[in-house]
């Protein structure tokens, strides 16, 4: 469960969020909507731990943990991260290499050894099947020539791995 209680946030001295409260239960999907400048991106940035946002009051808890006390890496590992609205293309870098490098960097941060190739391929195949994605996707350059939907599925695949 994600719970935001009476959250107040300033950016460069300007009050952006003024007492926001929100509860999202496991399995629920919510859309945060509002006009430009309402604080949608600010809320996402604060939850993800982006620098430059000052929480002046309130709490954020995720699965019983105080999000505001978590490092950015801890938040990302817990699934609290921001996806790019327009993911960058990386010509010449295949998805399979990016996925393995990202996973091994995460494992290294936790003090774990690199994942063996057979174990990595098993994990990737499971996640591809879950996402209903073809394995040829792995050989394509990261986001290069992808449709909008493919870019989003690629981001979800990265998150799952």
Indicate residue ranges for each PLM-predicted region.
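Conserved structural motif at the start of ABC-family nucleotide-binding domains
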Residues: 2-4, 17
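Short coil-to-beta microelement around the adenine-binding A-loop and adjacent beta1/P-loop entry
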Residues: 14-17, 74
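The feature captures the beta-strand-to-loop junction immediately N-terminal to the Walker
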Residues: 33-35
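Helix-to-loop junction immediately C-terminal to a conserved catalytic motif
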Residues: 48
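ABC ATPase NBD Q-loop/coupling interface
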Residues: 59-75, 143
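ABC-family P-loop ATPase nucleotide-binding domains
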Residues: 88-161
């Amino acid at each position: 469960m994600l719970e935001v209680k009476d959250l107040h946030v300033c950016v460069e001295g300007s009050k952006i969020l003024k007492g926001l409260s929100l509860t999202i239960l496991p399995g629920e999907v919510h859309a945060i909507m509002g006009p430009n400048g309402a604080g949608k991106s600010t809320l996402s940035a604060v939850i993800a731990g982006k620098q430059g946002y000052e929480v002046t009051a309130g709490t954020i808890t995720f699965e019983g943990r105080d999000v505001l006390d978590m490092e950015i890496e801890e938040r990302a590992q817990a699934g609290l991260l921001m996806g790019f609205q327009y993911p960058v293309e990386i010509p010449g870098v295949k998805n399979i290499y990016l996925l393995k490098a990202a996973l091994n960097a995460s494992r290294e941060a936790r003090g774990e050894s690199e994942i063996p190739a057979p174990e990595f391929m098993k994990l990737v195949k499971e996640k591809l099947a879950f996402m209903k994605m073809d394995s040829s996707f792995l050989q394509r350059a990261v986001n290069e020539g992808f449709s909008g939907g493919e870019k989003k599925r690629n981001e979800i695949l990265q998150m799952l791995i």
